[in-house]
Amino acid sequence: MTKHAGTVERLRGLAWPTMLAGGLLLVLLAQVQWGSTDEGVEPSITGLGRVTILGASDDDVEFFFEDNTGRPGLSVVVLGAVIAVVAALGWWRPRLRPSAIGLIGLASVIVLVVGIRTLSDPAAHLFSDRVSEALDADLPDMQAGYGLIGTVVVAILLLVVVGFWVLSSVWPRAGAADRVEINRTDESS
């Protein structure tokens, strides 16, 4: 085994715990700030729809915003848990790895789409239309929170790990086949 092949195998071994950690990180990032604004009462909202307003009691905020948030982070929590469980299964059982890597890749793409879609207009995806009707004004301009940005970054990193695992499982086999062909030619001479 060459030095390069040994390094690739060690990195492939780290892919599964990395994907497990990425799935758990997605679950955590959905529960922190996805958007905030400096306008009006300066609300801050998590991916799961929990709104925080400085100086307001939690009961008042919950009464007004209870059913008026979009909760895009809910799908991220579910998909993050799926990624973590499937990565643990792939790490534990090598025969499950091809299907596990496909499922992790698909879930990561969906998380990335949810994250980018929410990142494009946080207020529109975090609050429902009823909030603007109740405020009798347009939704405030919101800045993306660290949870939303982190979700997009983790989804991209998961896709990079999936791509590396797939490519590294295909390329060494092609190299091994070439070496076998060379050896056959050498032996027959």
What are these regions (language model features)?
Residues 32-39, 93, 117-124, 164-178:
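Juxtamembrane transmembrane-helix termini
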Residues 94-132, 183-189:
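Hydrophobic alpha-helical transmembrane segments of integral membrane proteins
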Residues 10-36:
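N-terminal signal-anchor transmembrane alpha helix
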Residues 70-92, 152-159:
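Hydrophobic alpha-helical transmembrane segments
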Residues 1-16, 163-189:
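Intrinsically disordered terminal tails
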Residues 28-73, 122-144:
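Long, glycine/tryptophan/cysteine-rich extracytoplasmic
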Residues 15-22, 79-83, 100-110, 147, ...:
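Hydrophobic alpha-helical transmembrane segments of polytopic
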